[in-house]
Curated annotation (Swiss-Prot):
Domain EGF-like residues, every copy: 666-700
Name the record gives this protein: Disintegrin and metalloproteinase domain-containing protein 1
UniProt cross-references to PANTHER family, sorted A to Z: ADAM A DISINTEGRIN AND METALLOPROTEASE DOMAIN (PTHR11905), DISINTEGRIN AND METALLOPROTEINASE DOMAIN-CONTAINING PROTEIN 1A (PTHR11905:SF120)
Domain Peptidase M12B: residue ranges: 238-432
Carbohydrate attachment residues: N259, N410, N633, N720
Quaternary structure note: Heterodimer with ADAM2/fertilin subunit beta.
Disintegrin domain mapped to chain residues: 441-525
Source taxonomy: Eukaryota, Metazoa, Chordata, Craniata, Vertebrata
Amino acid sequence: MSVAASASRSASTLCSPQIQQGALKEAKVPPHIWAARHWNLGLRLVPGHASVRAGILVLLIFLPSTLCDLGSVYDSSYETVIPERLPGQGSDDPGGKVSYVLLMQGQKQLLHLEVKGHYSERNFPVYSYHHGILGQEVPLLSQACHYEGHIEGVPGSFVSVSICSGLRGVLIKEETAYGIEPLLFSTDFEHILYTMAHQPVVLCNVTPTDSLGDSSQRQGSSKTDELLALSDLWSHAKYVEMFVVVNHQRFQMWGSDVNTTVQAVVDIIALANSFTRGINTEVVLVGLEIWTEGDPIEVPVDLQATLRNFNLWRQEKLMGRVRHDVAHLIVGHRPGANEGQAFLDGACSGGFAAAVEAFHHEDVLLFAALMAHELGHNLGIRHDRPGCTCGPKHLCLMHETISKTSGFSNCSSDHFLRFLHDHRGACLLDRPWHQSHKRRDAHCGNGVVEESEECDCGNACDSHPCCEPTCTLKVGAQCSEGLCCYKCTFKKKGTLCRPAEDVCDLPEYCNGITGECPANSYMQDGTQCDRIYYCSGGLCKNPDKQCARIYGYPARSAPEECYISVNTKANRFGNCGHPTSANLKYEACSNEDIFCGKLVCTDVRYLPQVKPLHSLLQIPYGDDWCWSMDAYNVTDIPDYGDVQGGTYCAPKKVCMESICTGHATLQYDCHPQEMCHGNGVCNNFKHCHCDAGFSPPDCSSGGNGGSVDSGPVGKPADRNLSLFGVGESPDSRMEDEEINLKVVVLVVPIFLIVLLCCLMLIAYLWSEVQEAVSPGSSSTTSSSESESD
């Protein structure tokens, strides 16, 4: 039986959107559409037709094997349940078994669960970026959370849940999938149990590749002592060591939180194992890299190109750092026509052990099936043909249309056995967590600060002022890199290292004992800002500000009439939903959702620099124009022209996935009057960030403000002195200001004295001149008078 994970919220998925043309027919003045010329990426805009003139360049160096397309997913119903754990079972049970009773649709159901193996190496490395520097952390995860089992008395049922913080996972009962997850902040152990209804989910077109080369290049080909006879290969347990990379957009979709991202990936791996167990194979997470500050490679809509770029990055940056059998990239954007790409037979090869999957929705069950499907291609498994079976199911996991409640077919088993035979499966036979080395030892000189290293200057050690080539700090150095490190010493405690960038953002300060700035913190989602708007992700989701960010001041959100004209047209310039297949159309916005489709702006005085395949729509409105943008085929953000999630759309309502819904969806549960004694706000870690004059954790006593997450705030007199860049020291700034003050104190009086002396001299000279002139005038007059006599 094969299943995957629960989803806290489900969403429709994009399938190769077909561009719908057409403008606003009722407009008296025809609308103008502006598109960037492909041969000129500058600021100049050129008028064009309603369609974007774009040439498609298909460049295939290595031809990946799958072209996958997801359908739509939605939650149909839910109920609140309270799972009751039967006494005398659990972690103390040597068998690792536990049972729960819960009420499903009015009937008591007994869940029998058993702990499953660890699907990650102990202390696997997590890499992330901090101001351009790649660092490594070790996650703190419980090793015995994932349980699987069945529902008593229900044939064919299956349960896969994590039980460490409530029950979170999926239940399969009578061909129906249910998601279960704990209700946040419930004091009665309440959970949400919801039906996960769905349409056919994944469509794939397989294209075989012959570019892998001979098997002599594969990992482990020389380990002849580990090779097993063909008859033993199938029964022998196999392990796929998978390294996962999460791109920046998907990281943002997980709240830009490293811990949340790590836990989500661990859950996905555990649930993918529910599928791969059918071929006696376990997927083991050996490492994770999160692109926290942006993607180091180009991640286009075409996942075939993304796979090519990712594989080159993997060969150059990853292979020498962490050993892996396959590496998978999780991207967060809606792809063009394909939801996944993988190299066929790529596992265990040094050159082609890669795959890419799009996770732009929130159906973890569906995504786990997609990951297992793409991994199947890495393991040599092709698409099922007519006649392939997997028990009573009509569609199996490797069919072109994937069912997330089915498993591998008999044909898949044959393909996998052939892969093991042809390539001897050497890399799949070692049990990762039984090895003496959990991962590669720290490699000094790779530019990554790893365990046991104080610093790593890479190839720049000769000129590095703080770090030795041996990856140790130089004598007298306290640090090497970081926002709180200046000239190899820690910046002063309380120094501002990351200022607030929005009214919903919060500042961070150095603690004086490390070179790193604390993790970014901001006001909890749902905090009110600018009177009627709400904070989300550290930004005040004000549509006027969004327009100003795109078009510059004084652009603002357009009147309701413009939104109605644009967002009811159901085309790429105005809609409340992308097509879910090539045969469907864009969705028009209803009256309730009219402000949640495309962002419409007015008072536009400056046009933005239009990127390739971006288009602007200009329509008349009174004496002005209204503007809409389509970021078709651009993946740096979901769609720059869409109204952002969390944006105000009606009193006490916000936009979320093109729907105007209650602001409760932001899950704001802070009571600052009680939690922070009215002297602060709640941050994204659900801790108080205190106002100046009060101290954390609850803002009830005097202090300098801040939170337990922000680092200690400096004294008010020091705060202005801390507003310096990475390359400036607070001490040097203070010294400069002292020098300037001395100069002012000395120069100004001297200048005044000199000026006074000059004035006095001028006055004296002027008086002398007057005295010299006056006697001469008198004598002349007298002489004249004498002569006249």
